[in-house]
Design a protein with these regions (language model features):
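Extreme N-terminal basic, low-complexity initiation segments
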Residues: 1-9
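Conserved core of the sugar-phosphate nucleotidyltransferase
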Residues: 169-252, 256
């Protein structure tokens, strides 16, 4: 791995995607940046985003929502096209945070017909700080299969995996990249709700995690439900589906069984990897994670990112 001779900091003027919301100092900062690959899972059908609701959206946002195109959701109100001095797609903010966190290249996992993402990031939206690649997941059969789709891109290098509809603080990205092996951040459920601003009941749909006294992942529980979190309390640890992997995850993604929900799911593949002897390190993370999975999320994301200028 190439260790860049600097400490994580924002060096350009103005507010960036790395500085949205509140980021607790001293938790994931002062981390030497590491050149890292990242895989963005953008193949989802966007079923929840497509559902009609009473959220007030601009015409461009309404079109993106109807198409389930969460990552291409225009942030901010404007009549100008994306990237032409007007609104920026949500993915620009995600890419900006990845670049600030030390990533040097990104692979989008997309559907065969996802031309909008390819056209934008190969054209006017091409990042200046990141190399862009694409991998096609032919069928929307789960996040484990999505990761498998990026095997050629990852090669034998370590890489990050994250959702395209979540915006993670750049210091968390930097600390994740700086781990010495596979791992993930651990968020306290109550703190995550308070800092991120999404509805409290949403956290019950996230994956819960158990760790040992050395901070190693023991097990991950996909969508355990309200009863689990009621018993675990405010300090229950959850995964926000952002990971550092090495090439061993591909065998686990291949071997993972079909879930009761009819998909090959990445958290279950991590369970397979654990059973195969892979050690996953964890670290306690804080700071807002913005979630753009529903129409009702758009207003909060707009507010949190007001004045932010992404520079991917």
């Amino acid at each position: 791995l190439l260790h860049l001779d600097l400490v994580f900091m924002r060096v350009s003027a103005g507010q960036s995607a790395a500085s949205f919301g509140k980021i607790e100092p001293g938790r994931a900062e002062n981390v030497a940046l590491i050149a890292m690959k990242a895989v963005l899972l953008a193949r989802g059908l966007g079923s929840r985003m497509k559902q009609e609701g009473d959220a007030v959206l601009s015409p461009g946002q309404a079109r993106a929502a109807s198409a389930g195109a969460k990552g291409m959701m225009p942030i901010g109100e404007s009549s100008t096209p994306l990237g032409a001095g007007g609104p920026r797609p949500f993915l620009d903010y995600v890419l900006d945070a990845l670049a600030d966190g030390g990533c040097t290249s990104v692979c989008f996992v997309v559907a065969p017909d996802h031309a909008a993402i390819r056209d934008y990031y190969r054209g006017d939206g091409r990042p200046s700080r990141l190399d862009i690649d694409f991998a096609v997941q032919p069928v929307a059969d789960g996040t484990a299969r999505a990761v498998q789709s990026a095997r050629r891109y990852a090669g034998r290098d370590p890489f990050l995996v994250l959702n395209s509809d979540n915006l993670y603080p750049a210091p968390v990205v930097a600390q994740l990249a700086a781990l010495t092996g596979p791992g993930l951040p651990a968020y306290e459920a109550e703190l995550l709700v308070r800092e991120s601003g999404f509805p409290r009941d949403r956290v019950t749909g996230f994956a819960a995690m158990d760790i040992d006294e050395r901070g190693r992942l023991v097990r991950i529980i996909e969508k355990p439900g309200p009863d689990y979190f009621d018993k675990a309390g405010a300090h229950a640890l959850v995964s926000m589906n952002v990971w550092r992997f090495d090439e061993r995850i591909f065998d686990a993604c291949r071997d993972v069984p079909l879930s009761p929900r009819g998909e090959y799911e990445l958290p279950q593949a991590v369970g397979v990897a654990l059973a195969q002897g892979v050690v996953f390190q964890t670290f306690r993370a804080s700071g807002a994670v913005l979630d753009l999975s529903r129409r009702s999320d758009v207003a909060l994301v707009n507010t949190r990112l007001a004045g932010v200028v992404p520079r991917p």
